[in-house]
């Protein structure tokens, strides 16, 4: 299994319940396709650097996971057709140095915070 990280941005107009539902949906897609989720990092609602689909803000999430390579095409397909996702990025960690960084990130986040809370980002003017 390969090491991956997916960052996705949800529409800012979603309620907290809808955001949690979409997060669970993405996690379900991963687990149904044999992925092992290491860590989920909710980064909160932040201002975007530029407008995406007429939105100036978005709710960010990062998920660190291990998965077979055939899952990535399915994950991309699901994220593309999900209307609430305004942008996503999937990163594959390949060499030893990258994998060590992935492990440090995913395990460091787990150990440093028992319950991860959204980060408070300063407002950008």
Curated annotation (Swiss-Prot):
InterPro entries: Ribosomal_bS6 (IPR000529), Ribosomal_bS6_sf (IPR035980), Ribosomal_S6_plastid/chlpt (IPR020814), Transl_elong_EF1B/ribsomal_bS6 (IPR014717). Binds together with bS18 to 16S ribosomal RNA. This is Small ribosomal subunit protein bS6. The keyword Ribosomal protein applies. Signal peptide: none annotated. One of its GO terms (biological process) is translation. Keywords: Ribonucleoprotein, Ribosomal protein, RNA-binding, rRNA-binding. SUPFAM superfamilies: Ribosomal protein S6 (SSF54995). GO terms for cellular component: cytosolic small ribosomal subunit. Belongs to the bacterial ribosomal protein bS6 family. PANTHER family: MITOCHONDRIAL 28S RIBOSOMAL PROTEIN S6, SMALL RIBOSOMAL SUBUNIT PROTEIN BS6M. Transmembrane segments: none annotated. The keyword Oxidoreductase does not apply. The gene is rpsF. GO terms for molecular function: small ribosomal subunit rRNA binding; structural constituent of ribosome. Gene3D superfamilies: 3.30.70.60.
